[in-house]
């Protein structure tokens, strides 16, 4: 009948086709209803945001069908653990969220559930003959942390947002763990987002500047060159040190662009020095994952007409373990052009020099 087919159409619009869970739209509506009818003293709701760690690697290594199998498995494992009245949704990609009722005086129940979810999802998923491993990060937010919890879908969105912020915090703390939402997490996240946006702007506006530290030969006491360091002269934040902006630039994928601009400036500066002095530059392990890194660097040397023999590239030991073949061929092509390549880990790395 027409009515039955309309209901079926509505049901299909409300579920995630891959896992059979709710989707974002139907979950938000259901959570809104639950919040509206909550008896505040006797009941609370915990929104539990779940995100798989390094899921992209599963797709890259094993293909999308393996990824889909992991998502279906994850949904089934979480669903089995949920108490009565719990609802699970897949929000998209590898993001899930569930809501569970609990007594506000017994939040440990929710802790236990989160711990079990993490344990169950970490068990390998069999895909063909290959066991596929994933872990997950969880953020939890409680209806007790909200004003105006009865605003239906609006309150649902706010509660979901809080659980998402806590989940992001769990990722930052090293993944494979859970955190309850705390208000300062919101400020940390806002600051982090401002930093990211500032770094992107700063690269475009040339706010990252090289400065130099002397390198002295310990035996002769003679100045042999300068090491290039970087600082960010930010109009909003003043001078920011590399310990803050380098890790973020690596994470958001702009370290290569930033480093090339700094090196280009440094080549121009170093042309003014005595021709005996070398320029030493630290290269991030993230840059060494770019198969074109050596080509880009050699191009910069030519463009700025800077002698390769005056350039000393310092890489860290960890670069060598990630992709020995590619790193080795990049180092060879740099050395063939006369660039010095040294390992910078203060004595720990020399065992790996033999690999080169």
Which residue ranges define each predicted feature?
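Short catalytic/binding micro-motifs of nucleotide second-messenger systems
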Residues: 37, 80-85, 106, 117-131, ...
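Short helix/loop segment flanking the catalytic signature motif in cyclic-nucleotide metabolism enzymes
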Residues: 70, 97-119, 140, 147-152, ...
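Conserved long alpha-helical elements within nucleotide-processing catalytic cores of c-di-GMP signaling
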Residues: 10-14, 20-46, 53-83, 89-93, ...
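Bacterial c-di-GMP phosphodiesterase EAL domain
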Residues: 184-187, 194-306, 316-319, 326, ...
